[in-house]
Amino acid sequence: MAMSSYMVNSKYVDPKFPPCEEYSQNSYIPEQSPGYYSPSQDTDFQHPGIYSRSNYSEQPYICSTVQGSSVQPRGHVQDQASTPSPFPAQTEQCPAVQISGSRTCGQQQNTKTQNGIPTKQPAVVYPWMKKVHVTTVNPDYTGPEPKRSRTAYTRQQVLELEKEFHFNRYLTRRRRIESAHTLSLSERQIKIWFQNRRMKWKKDHKLPNTKGRSASVGNQHAQHAQKDSQTEITTL
């Protein structure tokens, strides 16, 4: 209300300013100094506060007084010099406790690995995976013999095979199965042994080979046929 009465009594007139374009063209606005945006205040000027300030004097703090003050620190921190610890210091037993704890942890891990994870079993190696060149006769072996292997016969087995060869140089299927069971060999092993023994016997007795003998007989028949044809031509 006081402000409005002042405006009425003073007959205040609203000022009129030219447009901004005229200001920019006629350079009415002078260049302002950097200090224009931060106007300095007089040192003598003091703005009266709204509330009266109480007479409070600030006390400066000194580092020595702060360190030596009796203010207790916040939290669970306690002064070691003022309050002695109820438990005595045990420097020698601490490492022993840590070592025992680590050992128990290692034992627990080992038990977990043994109980939870099964141990790795060795890989199964089948007979066909082995590269065997010379094999000894195994009496408990009943399966087929691996290929490209040379069997080492025992003295007793060779003696029994020689007896069979002395009576008959060719074995029947039934006799071959019986001898294979008695000598703990396979039929293939006995068959190969008899083949080799027959070749050796022919070589010792200097008998001609059956293949060469048949070829020589064929050549003789051819020669006789040629001679007969020549004689017939001459007679004509």
Curated annotation (Swiss-Prot):
Keywords for this protein: Developmental protein, DNA-binding, Homeobox, Nucleus, Transcription, Transcription regulation
Comp. bias regions, Polar residues: 79-91, 211-223
UniProt-recorded Gene Ontology molecular function terms: DNA-binding transcription factor activity, RNA polymerase II-specific; RNA polymerase II cis-regulatory region sequence-specific DNA binding
Protein's UniProt name: Homeobox protein Hox-D4a
GO (cellular component) term, any one: nucleoplasm
Protein family per UniProt: Belongs to the Antp homeobox family. Deformed subfamily.
Record localization: Nucleus
Function: Sequence-specific transcription factor which is part of a developmental regulatory system that provides cells with specific positional identities on the anterior-posterior axis.
PROSITE patterns associated with the record: ANTENNAPEDIA (PS00032), HOMEOBOX_2 (PS50071)
Region annotated Disordered, chain positions: 69-91, 204-236
Gene behind the chain: hoxd4a
DNA-binding region(s), chain positions: 146-205
Primary location group: nucleus
Chain ranges for the short sequence motif Antp-type hexapeptide as given in the UniProt record: 125-130
CDD domains: homeodomain (cd00086)
Nucleus in keyword set: yes
One Pfam family per UniProt: Homeodomain
Gene Ontology annotations of biological process type: angiogenesis; anterior/posterior pattern specification; definitive hemopoiesis; embryonic skeletal system morphogenesis; hemangioblast cell differentiation; positive regulation of transcription by RNA polymerase II; primitive hemopoiesis; vasculogenesis
